[in-house]
């Protein structure tokens, strides 16, 4: 059983990332800790004027094979694995001295292989062998040994040594052990994922398959959640080991109640939708569907237009902006409606001051970032569906006019706006829009024509005029009924993928009603 506190008398330091190394080494030497080290780490410590003993001197074997073999030795691993109260006699017989602290980080395999021009040879040379072996030895023996794998751990480690007269607690040794095993698992997963994706080992810079033969995923828990999608379900939020800049997982919560499972799911839908717009935009989401989207001169204009689409559904919604939220807009929102979550890349001080009057409102800050998720995944029974993320945009030059009447410039602008929104609406998705704002949204229906009717109904309930609006459909119309319903509501132009067996009938219907229609050749199903 581990003693509560154990002294640190001997430490082995071997790091690729030398951040904080000298300060750590100096603090250990000040506590009369003997330092062992290897290669470049030993040189850095020695150059700082600190005493250090090379591992080669300890083992009697030089580093060999270009550094591939330097710590794989019983005098090293015995010093890490030796058990207090069990192995002292064996250690004494073979001249093995205990090592109480291991400070080690691994060859930078992840950063090297992240480079587009990384060769297979470079990748292989950055696979650490001795490092993970030592980490596992030290972490296994947490009853007697402490192990640090990250410069971010040094401050706490030194603070505990200071507070406990050069000793480390069992609780900290165990926590550091868990972190070390996690790091080894992450490292091995990165190697496995890279090699599994190599399509041809004969290529110098190998082509990598987007869907390797095996996937090893690592996620870090951000927080426990009050419950899952429903109160009888438990839940937690995890983020990628290396989150993409600008995505939801990089958020900072500035105020408000703890986030729920549904808050995060809705926030992701709102943020991904709003960040695709260049002009100031507001997206209001309810149950992962946009219920109001608009572009304006400023945040306030965009909010007023987005809210007007569906004031009823906006109640208790998630609001996202792609600009710094100003105080006037924050006041207008919080005075008018109940809000679950506010999201923006930043906030004026006055906006945050006013938000404190509604202390339960969750306020999230997500810094701008150009990064996009590369993949989408979905769990099914004992399996995982994986696909490239739907990051496909659309430009005017890609549209095909298929009707007798071509859309006007104003209609084209609205068609592209509606198309962007439809991408984030659950299928079957229909979006009515005019002047860069939504007029009505029909979401999640099993029949496309019913989604079209719901969009018209929503517009009517909000007292918005459909006449002169455009319609976007996330997938093709299998029959002409959706076009007939849209025309009856006052729609003037349509954007859809095309590709139906009855495209001819659908185009004829549009011509009969005098509608302009364009095909994108791209579908945006969302389930």
Swiss-Prot record:
Q: Sorted alphabetically, which keywords does the UniProt record give? A: Hydrolase, Multifunctional enzyme, Purine biosynthesis, Transferase
Q: Which domain of life is it from?
A: Bacteria
Pathway, per record:
Purine metabolism; IMP biosynthesis via de novo pathway; 5-formamido-1-(5-phospho-D-ribosyl)imidazole-4-carboxamide from 5-amino-1-(5-phospho-D-ribosyl)imidazole-4-carboxamide (10-formyl THF route): step 1/1; Purine metabolism; IMP biosynthesis via de novo pathway; IMP from 5-formamido-1-(5-phospho-D-ribosyl)imidazole-4-carboxamide: step 1/1
Q: Known SUPFAM superfamilies for this protein? A: Cytidine deaminase-like, Methylglyoxal synthase-like
**For this chain's UniProt record, which GO biological process terms are given?**
'de novo' IMP biosynthetic process
Q: Which residues form a coiled coil?
A: none
Q: Does the keyword DNA-binding apply?
A: no
Query: Which ranges carry the MGS-like domain?
Result: 1-149
Q: Which SMART domains match?
A: AICARFT_IMPCHas (SM00798), MGS (SM00851)
Q: Which NCBIfam families match?
A: PRK00881.1, purH
Q: What is this protein called?
A: Bifunctional purine biosynthesis protein PurH
């Amino acid at each position: 059983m581990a003693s509560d506190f154990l002294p640190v008398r001997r430490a082995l330091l071997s790091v690729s990332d030398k951040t904080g190394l000298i300060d750590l080494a100096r603090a250990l030497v000040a506590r009369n800790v003997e330092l062992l080290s290897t290669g470049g780490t030993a040189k850095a410590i020695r150059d700082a004027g600190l005493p250090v003993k090379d591992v080669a001197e300890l083992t009697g074997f030089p580093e060999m094979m270009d550094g591939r073999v330097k710590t794989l030795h019983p005098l090293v691993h015995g010093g890490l694995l030796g058990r207090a109260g069990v192995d002292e006699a064996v250690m004494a017989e073979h001249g093995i001295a205990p090592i109480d602290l291991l400070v080690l980080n691994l060859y930078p395999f992840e950063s090297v292989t992240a480079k587009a021009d990384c060769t297979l040879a470079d990748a292989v040379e950055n696979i650490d062998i001795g490092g993970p072996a030592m980490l596992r030895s030290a972490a296994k023996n947490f009853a007697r040994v402490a192990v640090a794998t990250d410069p971010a751990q040094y401050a706490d480690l030194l603070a505990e040594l200071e507070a406990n007269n050069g000793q480390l607690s069992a609780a900290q040794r165990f926590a550091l052990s868990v972190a070390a095993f996690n790091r080894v698992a992450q490292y091995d997963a990165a190697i496995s994922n890279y090699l599994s994706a190599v399509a041809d080992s004969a290529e110098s810079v190998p082509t990598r398959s987007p869907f390797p033969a095996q996937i090893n995923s690592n996620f870090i828990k951000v927080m426990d959640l009050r419950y899952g999608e429903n109160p009888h379900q438990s839940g937690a939020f995890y983020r990628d080991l290396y989150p993409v800049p600008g995505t939801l997982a990089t958020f900072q919560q500035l105020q408000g109640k703890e986030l729920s499972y549904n808050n995060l799911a809705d926030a992701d839908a709102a943020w991904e939708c709003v960040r695709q717009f260049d002009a100031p935009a507001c997206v209001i989401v309810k149950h992962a569907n946009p219920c109001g989207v608009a572009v304006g001169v400023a945040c306030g204009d965009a909010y007023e237009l987005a809210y007007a689409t569906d004031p009823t559904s906006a109640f208790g919604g998630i609001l996202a902006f792609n600009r710094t939220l100003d105080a006037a807009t924050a006041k207008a929102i919080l005075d008018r409606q109940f809000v679950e979550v506010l999201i923006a890349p930043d906030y004026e001080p006055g906006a945050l001051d006013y938000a404190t009057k509604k202390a339960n409102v969750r306020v999230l800050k997500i810094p701008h970032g150009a990064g996009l998720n590369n993949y989408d995944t979905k769990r099914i029974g004992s399996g995982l569906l994986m696909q490239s993320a739907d990051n496909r945009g659309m430009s005017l030059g890609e549209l095909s006019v298929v009707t007798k009447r071509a859309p006007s410039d104003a209609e084209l602008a609205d068609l592209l706006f509606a198309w962007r929104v439809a991408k984030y609406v659950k299928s079957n998705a229909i979006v009515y829009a005019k002047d860069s704002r939504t007029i009505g949204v029909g979401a999640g229906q099993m029949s496309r024509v019913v989604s079209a009717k719901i969009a018209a109904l929503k517009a009517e309930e909000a007292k918005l005029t459909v006449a002169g609006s455009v319609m976007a459909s996330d997938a093709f119309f299998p029959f002409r009924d959706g076009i007939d319903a849209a025309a009856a509501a006052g729609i003037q132009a349509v954007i859809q993928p095309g590709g139906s067996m009855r495209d001819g009938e659908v185009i004829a219907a549009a011509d009969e009603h005098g509608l302009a229609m364009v095909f994108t050749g791209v579908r945006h199903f969302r389930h």
